[in-house]
UniProtKB/Swiss-Prot annotation:
Pfam families: FKBP_C, Trigger_C, Trigger_N. The lineage of its organism: Bacteria, Pseudomonadati, Pseudomonadota, Alphaproteobacteria, Rhodobacterales. This is Trigger factor. Keywords: Cell cycle, Cell division, Chaperone, Cytoplasm, Isomerase, Rotamase. Involved in protein export. Acts as a chaperone by maintaining the newly synthesized protein in an open conformation. Functions as a peptidyl-prolyl cis-trans isomerase. It comes from Dinoroseobacter shibae (strain DSM 16493 / NCIMB 14021 / DFL 12).
């Protein structure tokens, strides 16, 4: 086997690989020898068929496999010897197209190598860690929200208002005929909750207990029950009771409803939860600042193919966000802009840097972290958690999609430990502004 370099410009590499006919023949013989013990043929005992006969019978069929394995082996040896890591799958092309059995195989291989990522002194990176304390106002606001969620309804006299609860019997009809699922008795409906068909709840505002009212509505065009979608309906309603909302008293009893021993304990739990939320938001801000610093600080050549692929994906994603009515790929080719290319360069540079740093420092995603991530995703599919878990276990691509952000965050945390970080206490509003500013940046 002979490997000759034909191109070495920047990260672009090209090689000519020659596999001799003798090497190819040896590979065919090797595969036949592996299979020989299991082959049966008329006139011979199992495993005793002569090699010459096996070659005549099966040699031609094994030739293609032998060619592929020989070329793959040559590539693997080249990458081991050279230390190159291809950015994408190498392009392989057989150059002697008039090849026939008995000839040497001549192959052209080209690829872009991943660049050498320079070592970086992360102690020169200066970052600000924003700190927000949960003040009394924020805790009281959270308590008010909990009290609202724990509210009860008490019977009232007079007409129903927005926010009141009406207890109703109803019977729905389309074209004068009742339909399945369109009737209920003693149904508690909070007006303004938008839990019914659009236009339904508004028509019950102003009604009183004992009143009967026909509610005219139209089912949405995208209604889940296709036989009702877009159709006009009349609901015969009997208002049996009108109730006004009453917020829960913010006291020890309410605290117990939420699993706390008393009100002070609940306040402490709320404070901890709020500060955990603030810390998560502050980390996102600090991470963005870190990535901005690294994008400026660390420079190295980027594989053009990776940048082009990333730019194409960015352009495609943004186009679909701007044209949500278009599904699939039935649209004109989308050309990346200069802005897309700049964003792609940033993503590729940071991606290669973080990947290299994680590999050098043996940063890994643990099985426990993966399980936690899968379970968090599975909660989005109530009742189907087991099926989702099994689907992820059998899908390497989905596993990688879950693993990648965990790995990135662990590498970022590693850099945080090395960087020069100072704390700065700010208000909740200032933190909110800092988070909102992230959307305005790259």
């Amino acid at each position: 086997m002979n490997v000759t370099e034909t191109l070495n410009e920047g990260l672009k590499r090209g090689y000519s690989i020659t596999v001799t006919a003798a090497e190819l023949d040896a590979k065919v013989n090797e595969k036949l020898s592996e299979a020989q013990p299991e082959i049966e043929m008329k006139g011979f005992r199992k495993g005793k068929v002569p090699m010459a006969l096996l070659k005549k019978q099966f040699g031609q069929k094994l030739l293609g496999e032998a060619m592929q394995e020989t070329i793959d082996g040559a590539m693997a040896k080249h990458f081991e010897d050279s230390g190159d890591r291809p950015a994408l799958q190498p392009e392989i092309k057989m150059t002697n197209e008039d090849w026939k059995e008995g000839d040497d195989i001549e192959v052209a291989m080209s690829y872009e190598a991943l660049p050498e990522v320079p070592d970086t002194d992360f102690s020169t990176v200066t970052l600000e860690k924003l700190v927000v304390k949960a003040d009394e106002e924020a805790v009281n606001e959270a308590l008010q929200n909990l009290a609202e969620n724990a509210k009860s309804f008490e019977t009232k006299e007079g007409a129903a208002e927005d926010g009141d609860q009406v207890v109703i019997d109803f019977l729905g009809k389309v074209d004068g005929e009742a339909f399945e699922g369109g009737a209920a008795e003693d149904y508690p409906l909070v007006l303004g909750s938008n839990s019914f068909i659009p236009g339904f709840e508004e028509q019950l505002i102003g009604t009183s207990a004992g009143e009967e009212k026909n509610v005219d509505v139209s089912f949405p065009e995208q209604y889940q029950a296709e036989h009702l979608a877009g159709k006009a309906a009349v609901f015969e309603c009997k208002i049996k009771e009108v109730k006004a909302p009453k917020a829960a008293e913010i006291d020890d009893e309410m605290a117990k409803q939420f699993g706390a021993e008393d009100l002070e304990t609940l306040k402490g739990q709320i404070s901890e939860r709020l500060e955990a939320e603030y810390a998560g938001a502050a980390r996102a801000v600090m991470k963005r600042k870190l990535l901005d610093e690294l994008d400026t600080l660390v420079k190295f050549e980027l594989p053009p193919s990776l940048v082009a692929t990333e730019a194409g994906q960015i352009a495609h994603q943004l186009w679909h966000e701007e044209n949500p009515e278009v599904e699939g790929h039935d649209h004109p080719e989308i050309e990346p802009t200069e802005e897309h290319n700049k964003l792609a360069e940033r993503r590729v540079r940071l991606g290669l840097l973080l990947a290299e740093l994680g590999q050098k420092n043996e940063i890994q995603v643990t099985d426990a972290e993966m399980t936690q991530a899968i379970m968090a995703q599975a909660r989005q599919y109530p009742g189907q958690e087991r099926q989702f878990f099994e689907f992820i276990q059998q899908n390497q691509q989905m596993q990688q999609q879950l693993r990648a952000p965990i790995f990135e965050d662990k590498v970022v945390d590693y850099i945080f430990e090395l960087a020069t970080v100072t704390e700065k206490e700010i208000s909740k509003d200032d933190l909110q502004k800092a988070v909102e500013a992230l959307d305005d940046e790259v």
